[in-house]
């Protein structure tokens, strides 16, 4: 699962002539004691169902706190099976990044 970006990320002079069409969450950490979710994502592409980070992709970090944290934790916990919770959490986090204007694209 990744986000197909509306406009591909352009790393400019760091990787001349290349653009990265997708964003992928590579780490998500829920910290209940500080009531925050930390999301790390990268730009790159999917190649044969495997994530390939762009050569010059900066890792981006988003911290989710407050009411957004509470809402996301509640929506990610609506399943009884742990594998569904993790997949659901990733989808919810992608949607959050899109809704907040951090990413623009379609979840695939």
What residue ranges belong to the model's regions?
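Viral virion structural and adsorption modules
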Residues: 1-40, 44-108
């Amino acid at each position: 699962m990744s986000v197909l970006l509306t406009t591909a990320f352009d790393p400019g002079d760091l990787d001349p002539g290349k653009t990265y069409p997708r964003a992928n969450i590579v780490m998500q950490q829920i910290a209940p004691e500080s009531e925050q979710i930390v999301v790390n994502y990268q730009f790159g592409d999917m190649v044969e169902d495997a994530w390939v980070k762009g050569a010059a992709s900066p890792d981006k970090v988003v911290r989710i706190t407050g009411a957004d944290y509470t809402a996301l934790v509640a929506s990610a916990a609506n399943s009884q099976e742990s594998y569904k919770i993790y997949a659901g959490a990733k989808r919810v986090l992608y949607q959050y990044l899109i809704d907040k204007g951090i990413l623009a694209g379609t979840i695939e």
